[in-house]
Amino acid sequence: MLAGGQAMAGDLLQWQTNSLTYLYGKDFQVNPRIQQTVTFEHADGWKYGDNFFFIDKIFYNGKEDAFAGENTHYGELSPRLSFNKIFDQKFEFGPIKDVLLAMTYEFGEDDTESYLIGPGFDLAIPGFDYFQLNFYNRHTEGDRPGDDVWQITPAWSYTIPVGGSDVLIDGFMDWVVDNDVNSKGEYHANLHFNPQVKYDLGKALHFGEKQLYVGVEYDYWKNKYGIEDSQGFKTDQSVTSFLVKVHF
């Protein structure tokens, strides 16, 4: 979630923002049902593109996951190279204001590593702080299913003034559109929709804007982890979590 940014002096790093988020939610699927998560996020813009990184530390409230134990971690690193910046020309047409080479590295415990690459676009949509649309071809580490499938990932931010403060609606969606089958098993198309609705409490209390947020995160995941939902094993997830987020 790219909320706010701090302008930086110098030619290489143009802006950056860092944050810590605490989330508490119930009714997760596949993993233990109650989860507390601490997330570190970093985003920046630099001379030739932008970067986004996050890592989750997930606690299962004393329960044990079959593979990860009482806690686990998961993260993603997503650099993008901007054609506008690299070629010093405007690659703009219609709503598209920049064309990028988008990449993502997914990592965590167990067999989770994947490498994603494809075209990305920054869109100018009225009212939005930003709107990104990335198309990835996924490549898994090892021989597990889910290799060479396509994923569509929009990410967005929208600010609504409310009284003396703001409500920020931001988030992403990962939509893997293909199925894959190999000797190790099956991987099903899945959709992960993850918006946050946050109130700028810091601005309301005159601590400074875009520094302290409270709100909720909604996590919908159809066929979580690419596992097909069934009567015997539910993998369709719908969870609302409470959150507190601090930018620094």
Protein language model regions, located:
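Short glycine/proline- and aromatic-enriched beta-strand/turn motifs that initiate or cap beta-hairpins
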Residues: 9-58
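Short loop/turn motifs that connect adjacent beta-strands in outer-membrane beta-barrel proteins
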Residues: 9-16, 48-52, 83-100, 124-132, ...
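Surface-exposed loop and membrane-interface regions of Gram-negative outer-membrane beta-barrel proteins
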Residues: 54-105, 190, 224
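Outer-membrane beta-barrel "beta-signal"
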Residues: 236-248
